[in-house]
Design a protein with these regions (language model features):
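Core catalytic alpha/beta fold that binds nucleotide/phospho-ligands
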Residues: 1-144
């Protein structure tokens, strides 16, 4: 059986645009990796989508913004344009400690907003039917 954790975030593109105008270098270097910046430049809608993806990933990992650094989560497309998540440092350690087997990311944006949804997958070992039957029999015996 597979269990899921989901993170969702919505970002106002205008907010990212204002951050770029007021704190361009500090904001960019604190939040985005060099590869993300090469890909997106100063295009606020692309950076807002990546910002939302990082927030959604932190939620799916259960860490919040204080648990991992922004640049420990990287969002880059594959050759077909599908966004992929790359985890480093504490973000990667957290995913491994949770036993995550995959992270799936979806990005979308309109004129005013960018949003991201992250689904974290965790494979649970299949039930052992004999062990489950044994557990049930013990419970039934205890009831009598």
């Amino acid at each position: 059986m597979t269990s899921l954790a989901v993170g969702v975030d919505l970002v106002e593109i205008g907010r990212v645009h204002r951050l770029l105008q007021r704190h361009r270098d500090r904001f960019r270097s604190r939040v985005f990796t060099p590869a993300e910046l090469r890909l997106c430049g100063d295009r606020a809608h692309l950076l807002a989508a990546r910002f939302a993806a990082k927030e959604a990933t932190m939620k799916a990992l259960g860490t919040g913004a204080r648990g991992v650094a922004w640049r420990e989560i990287e969002v880059l497309p594959n050759r077909r344009g599908k966004p992929l998540l790359f985890l480093y440092g504490r973000a990667k350690e957290r995913a491994q400690s949770l036993g995550l087997t995959g992270l799936d990311l979806s990005l979308s944006h309109s004129r005013d907003f960018a949003m991201a949804t992250v689904v974290a997958l965790q494979e649970e070992p299949p039930d052992d039917p004999q062990a489950e039957r044994g557990w049930l029999m013990e419970r039934l015996d205890a009831i009598r």
